[in-house]
Structures are given as structure tokens and as C-alpha cells.
From Swiss-Prot:
Organism placement in taxonomy: Viruses, Riboviria, Orthornavirae, Pisuviricota, Pisoniviricetes
Subunit organization: Interacts with host PRKRA/PACT.
Signal peptide segment: none
Coiled-coil ranges per UniProt: none
Keyword Magnesium: no
Name of the protein in its database record: Non-structural protein ORF4a
Record's subcellular location: Host cytoplasm
């Protein structure tokens, strides 16, 4: 699943909703920082993605992969919290879309 596209779709749906009032949410924004990597990937990328009051960071070997990882974390937070305040809700049908989080792992042990 392309989580960056999912966040963009949520943002567009939110802007086009007739029930959206008084709360402007800017589109998802990403900031990249290069990091020292490994011998296999000499440069790693830290992506800090912000959307709807959430900010998540992820590190990966390419900017695109780091952005996808950060977008997945924000999508999970939106799902967990019930969506954007005063607007769209996000309920995913299949929990298998997300890897098992640390929070879920602690309950299974």
C-alpha cells in the first residue's frame, strides 16, 4: 500500500468535505536529513513527515522508503485516534495493513 498517496487522498477528501469548518489542515510535508549509513548504504535518509498535527520520523536507505515508513506511522496514528479532528475519519478494514506495533506486542506476551 502506498501510504503517502493515502495521506494525500485523506487530505483532499478533507478539503472537499462540505462538513469541514474552521480548521485548515495543510497537505503532508516532508523534511529530509542525510545521515551516515553503513558500508552497504553509505547515506541513509531521515524523513520527518508532518500531517494533521502528527509528526513522525523514519530512517531508510532512500528518501522514498523513509517517507513511506513515516507515512505508515502517521496513517496508523490517524486510524488509532479515529481520523482528523472536525473532518474525515480513517478506519482501515484489515489490521494486517500494519505490522504488529510494539504496543500490540506487549499485550501478546
Amino acid at each position: 500500500m502506498d501510504y503517502v498517496s493515502l495521506l494525500n487522498q485523506i487530505w483532499q477528501k478533507y478539503l472537499n468535505s462540505p462538513y469541514t469548518t474552521c480548521l485548515y489542515i495543510p497537505k503532508p510535508t516532508a523534511k529530509y536529513t542525510p545521515l551516515v549509513g553503513t558500508s552497504l548504504h553509505p547515506v541513509l535518509w531521515n524523513c520527518q513527515l508532518s500531517f494533521a498535527g502528527y509528526t513522525e520520523s523514519a530512517v531508510n536507505s532512500t528518501k522514498a522508503l523513509a517517507k513511506q515508513d513515516a507515512a505508515q506511522r502517521i496513517a496508523w496514528l490517524l486510524h488509532k485516534d479515529g481520523g482528523i479532528p472536525d473532518g474525515c475519519s480513517l478506519y482501515l478494514r484489515h489490521s494486517s495493513l500494519f505490522a504488529q506495533s510494539e504496543e500490540e506486542e506487549s499485550f501478546s506476551n
